[in-house]
Amino acid sequence: MQTSPLLETLMEALRCLPGVGPKSAQRMAFQLLQRDRSGGMRLAQALTRAMSEIGHCADCRTFTEQDICTICANPRRQQNGQICVVESPADIHAIEQTGQFAGRYFVLMGHLSPMDGIGPGDIGLDRLEQRLEKESVTEVILATNPTVEGDATANYIAEMCGQYGVVASRIAHGVPVGGELEMVDGTTLSHSLAGRHVIKF
């Protein structure tokens, strides 16, 4: 079936989003054109502004339209002395929602992967090392993903922290709250057993 070249271009552009295949892209395009043209215009304007104006924080590398993001610019966060290392800006959002962390962050934008040619310089570890050297950092919390690459990245950073006398800790991994043991995979259960703690009364 022949369709408008502009419509084809729109559907192809929508497919750059994660999890969006040809059918989903078609539904989105038709929805915008049939029922929500004003929403489509707002989306186009927001995308144009975001793509041209959002960059990276000079300190932590998260997304921001300022030179320094609001978290890094917060004096109380600066005095905290803790840096939480994460793989992506989305991880910051997840941790912030817990309300349990009051320090600053460092975003790797990925993880070490020698097989893919991704080394320390590609994930900003030179910048992190500068922060360890110049700032009063008391602890680096390693919140990389619980994968082989995430663990390797955490170990590399922990070794780097040791050179500057900075404590490096790894977030706990294990059984999710409300989960049933029989449904948990063996690797996760192993981590849970290894990371057990004493119950104090």
Swiss-Prot record:
GO terms for biological process: DNA recombination; DNA repair. One of its GO terms (molecular function) is DNA binding. A zinc finger (C4-type) spans 57-72. InterPro entries: DNA_Rcmb_RecR (IPR000093), Rcmb_RecR (IPR023627), Rcmb_RecR_Znf (IPR015967), TOPRIM_dom (IPR006171), TOPRIM_RecR (IPR034137). It comes from the Bacteria. Keywords: DNA damage, DNA recombination, DNA repair, Metal-binding, Zinc, Zinc-finger. Residues 81-176 form the Toprim domain. Pfam families: RecR_C, RecR_HhH, RecR_ZnF, Toprim_4. The keyword Nucleotide-binding does not apply. The keyword Metal-binding applies. NCBIfam families: recR. PANTHER family: RECOMBINATION PROTEIN RECR. May play a role in DNA repair. It seems to be involved in an RecBC-independent recombinational process of DNA repair. It may act with RecF and RecO. Belongs to the RecR family. This is Recombination protein RecR. It comes from Serratia proteamaculans (strain 568).
